[in-house]
Every structure is written in C-alpha cells, then in structure tokens.
Amino acid sequence: MKLDEFEKYVADCAQYGLNVVNLDGSGEATMAKNLPEYIKVVKKYGAKAFIFSNGFKMEGQYMRDCVDAGLDFYRFSFIGSDEQDYSKWMYNAVGGHYAQIRRNIEEMVAYVKESGSDCVVSTYHLITDNNNIDEELEKYKTLVDELGVKTEIWKMHNWSGAWDIGDNARKGKIKTCGRPFSPDVVIRAGGLDKKTGAVHPCCQVLGRDEEAVLGHCSEDNIADIFFGEEYETLREQHRTGDYPDFCKSCDFLIEDPEVLVYTNHERDLMKMHGTKFDLNDYRD
C-alpha cells in the first residue's frame, strides 16, 4: 500500500477513535523498505503502532529506524521450541534461521533499552504437538527467559479453516467469534477489479481473501462500509449461525478456554493487543 493511501485510510478511521494500527494484517510489514514512515503516520494520528512479524529483516539500522519512529509493539513469530523444530516450521533461506532470529531479538531488546524507547518486544509461539504440551511449554519458557521478552504461547490454530491439523484441532461449542460486531476493521492493500483498500471482517480469512471483501476504501469511506449492506449481511449470518464459507470452518468460532497456554504479560484471550474492547461482549 502506498504511503499516501495508507495515511488517507488512517485519517478516515481516526475520526471515530483510533487506538491501535496493526501494520501487518496477515502479511509481512517488513517487506516495506520505508516502514518507519508508516509508523510515523500512525503516531501522527495518536494511535499505537503494532507489528506482528517473522522478524527476518528486523535488524541493524532498519530495526533502529522503526524503533525511533515510535513503534510501540513488535512481536516475533517464533514457531518451534528448539533449533530443529524452528527449522521445520519457519526456515527460510533469506533469514529464517534459529540463531539469526535469536540475534535479531537480542539486538532489538538491547536497542530498546539503550534508546529509552517504550517499545515492547514480544514473541509468539505455537504448541506443535498437543500430546507434548508440557515439554514444549517448558522449552519455550526457557527460551523466553533467556531472551528477556514478553510472550504468548498458543495451541495450534486453523483460523481460516483451510488446513487439516488433525489431533491439534480445537474442540468446543461453536458460536460467533464476535468480530463482525466489534470496532475492529481490517484494510488490505489490494482489492477486487483494480480497486484497493479491500475491507475484511478480520485478518483470519487467510487465503480466502477474495471471498471476504466487504467493500473498498478506495471507493467508500470506512463508516459507509462498516454500516453497509455487505457488513450487515455478515453480521446476520453470525447471529443465525448460517456462517459464510470463509467463516464456517474457522476455529475462532470454537470456544476453547485453554487455547492460550501461557503468557507472561497482560494478554487476554478475547482482547486483541492494545484494544479496549472484549470480544466476549460481542458473542452473545
């Protein structure tokens, strides 16, 4: 997404109150070479700038520029509790190496402390085998303690419903996730039919993006989309339980209170990072 287009959308949302802008959606924010400029836009409108990332490129001057721009929260996705498991789940020839990611985290933690930044450096981990939770959890906790970061450790998820995760599948009562009713909007860079700024109900549609477009910010303002026909149709589907295809297999609909296995900071299962609302308030 171009910087001027991004600022247009941020300014539009800011009219209605803006607490947090997550700069990644379901993509990789560090693909943008001028990412610090996007962070500055978020700060200009009084919101917090959050990024969830694989962390491959978050090093050196690029990392320092992001922190200095006012980044509030950066989360490294770190799947695999040791080098062997990390290589299985996260390996990438460009930067997905266990030792490299550890160095990137350590470097960022050190710079945040050195610069006096309030940026929170965090990691995100998944239990890859529900039959081996205790052992994996202890290995993750040791890693987190060594790195000196905040963390959250979750059971395996299948939010888009696009994969068969076997024995790791969640189990529980199915009801609306609450997201279509919540004050959270997801704006993508691209769109349909050469439009841009596609609006999705959440970032978990993963791979089913074309099915889940509720409007385009290049064509309408965010209020018209949020209160528009497509959004209201989705809300009614969530009220009745007649979920659309891009929702009905998503395991975010499943009530599983044990899905958040461990956290060492204020991370509530039903509250998205930095937001004030509770999704439970929108699930009844």
Where are these regions (language model features)?
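Radical SAM/AdoMet-radical enzyme domain recognition
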Residues: 1-146, 150-154
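Glycine-centered positions within short beta-strands or beta-hairpins
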Residues: 190-192, 196-198
